[in-house]
Amino acid sequence: MSDWFRHFGFAEVGDDLLMGAYPQDTDDVAALREAGVTAVFNLVQDVEYELAGGRDACATARGDAGIREERVEVVDYGNLLPGHIELAAKTVLAWLQEGERVYVHCRAGMQRSAVVSAAVVALHEGLEPLEALERVRERNPQANPLSHQRQDLLRWWAERTP
């Protein structure tokens, strides 16, 4: 397992919903597979992958393990557009309804993935978005979006709710 993945790790933040750091190598993907992950929603940009060939090696390992992936590249420390949150949340929610065990990740598993995971929990459990974020944080204390990302979560919710 990579030092990065060992340090930042991942946690289950909902029924069959996990969030955390990005896998950097085949051992990291194997750890996800051992945790029962069957689908991954990736929020990382290509420029964030530190290891040469890291993304390609992970894609191959995911494919070999039968783990599907969808991806929306979101700038680290940046804003999450309502459309990106909606796409990610709907995709993850659909997977959960299909019986998948889903892993949502950004680089360190603290900001972007926390916003998307909170959006999923809000939709799945009928919670207000900040209440959903607190639920995520109870299960993964390092989940801590930046203040503007919390505002992005609220803006997404306001734009999707009449």
Regions found by a protein language model. Give the residues of each.
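Non-catalytic nucleic-acid substrate-recognition regions in nucleic-acid-modifying enzymes
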Residues: M1
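Cysteine-based protein phosphatase catalytic domain of the PTP/DSP
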Residues: W4-F8, E12-R101, H124-Q151, R155, ...
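A phosphate-binding catalytic loop at a beta-strand-loop-alpha-helix junction
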Residues: G99-A118
